[in-house]
């Protein structure tokens, strides 16, 4: 299997984990960590469910992988994530010594692997990652867009119902 085919395969797996987040009404981001062609960690956004602002997909996958390989250094691992990491997660990837980051959709608001800043390639830090961006970007971005459209519609409907109930009193 070529690197391109591997990237497609594992990003599809990350999208499946993003579906788990969406089923819990979390922002649909999924991540998988791979070492030597084997899944060693996986996660999806769980910040709302866990009341934990650090429970991003990347964080959950890294925690699981560390336990599985019994090491906090995830050397020679590749992280596949459906959305470009935020500053917190980018820092985590550097500290974890992950070799390679592959992400789908760019994040113009908090993207820290090239969009608004580039923590994962910062030369002042003691580790930099190889980065491949835009893998299955359209599918990843569409999943997020669909989620936020639905969420805005639900919020609008809830406001309408609240206003209607207030008028009936």
Task: Identify the role of each PLM range.
Residues 40-47:
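Short beta->alpha transition motifs characteristic of CBS
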Residues 55, 59, 63-100:
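Helix-adjacent hinge/juxtasegments
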Residues 14, 18-21, 31, 57, ...:
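Small-residue (primarily alanine) positions within well-ordered alpha-helices
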Residues 29-37:
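Short beta-strand scaffold segments in enzyme catalytic cores
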Residues 1-21, 92-169:
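Zinc-dependent deaminase
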Residues 47, 81, 105:
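Residues that line or immediately flank small-molecule/substrate-binding pockets and catalytic motifs
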Residues 25-29, 75:
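Short, basic and Ser/Thr-rich N-terminal targeting/leader segments
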Residues 5, 27-28, 48-56, 60, ...:
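Residues at secondary-structure transition points
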């Amino acid at each position: 299997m070529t690197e391109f085919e591997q990237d497609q395969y594992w990003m599809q797996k990350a999208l499946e984990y993003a579906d788990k987040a969406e089923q819990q009404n979390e922002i649909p981001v999924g991540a998988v960590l791979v070492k030597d062609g084997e899944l060693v960690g996986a996660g999806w956004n769980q910040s709302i469910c866990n009341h934990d602002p650090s429970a991003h997909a990347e964080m959950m996958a890294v925690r699981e992988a560390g336990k599985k390989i019994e090491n906090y250094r995830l050397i020679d691992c590749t992280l596949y994530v459906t959305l470009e990491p935020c500053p917190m997660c980018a820092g985590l990837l550097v500290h974890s010594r992950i070799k390679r980051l592959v992400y789908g959709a760019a994040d113009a608001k908090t993207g820290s692997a090239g969009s608004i800043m580039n923590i994962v390639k910062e030369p002042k830090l003691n580790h930099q990652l190889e980065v491949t961006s835009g893998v299955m970007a359209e599918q990843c971005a569409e999943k997020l867009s669909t989620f936020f459209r639905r969420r805005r519609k639900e919020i609008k409907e809830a406001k309408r119902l609240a206003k209607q109930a207030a008028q009936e009193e």
